[in-house]
């Protein structure tokens, strides 16, 4: 079971907390700094916050929503999201969400294909599967774009996917060399730190991040909402973990009884569906159900 502690600093590993910190216009400088570090080929001077909702592209009865959506001073749109738990179809989901704004571009151009340059940055608290695992032993950022296979010629900048696999970032605190690595570490451990570490206190950027994420500095109502959110997160995560553990146990038992691997897979699949139905009846959000069970949002909406 997951024991979520509420410490001195906001736990920005959580998607809603991340959005609350980096989505505030008062903290725009922090988001600009983070994006310039992750997207090292860009030089973002300013950005404009955009709506994260996409009208007309409902999944069941639920609108599609991004964690953070901004436009840079150069006109490039950047979408930022945090994903805590793995999903069996995560890469397909990422491509699907990358396509949604393109449809919006076409609508805005009234049928003309005037597509905006767009980058989707996903901070993942897990590891993706890659064909060449050796390359990823010391690398946690992957970049995908639309290019010709042999020559590398660029087809379009309408879809660029950047995955930061924080599940691969293992550097200890004392070995962090730069602000990018310090950001990665904070995205993993901010909520656990009792104070700003000495190695980070030397960085003006890190001092700023720690200042705005100190829980006691929050307005009273915002602090109350944070405590409520983290408590609810703990309760939901524990329910989900229990359901997943039960589902795995039952699936394994059925597989042994039938003597076939198919039996185990089928048992696990049925338990995931059962857990999803139960969570849905309790009013748990589709996004959390999807993260917990590995089912797609479309599959959950159909239950």
Segment roles from a protein language model:
Residues 1-303:
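Elongated, amphipathic alpha-helical interaction scaffolds
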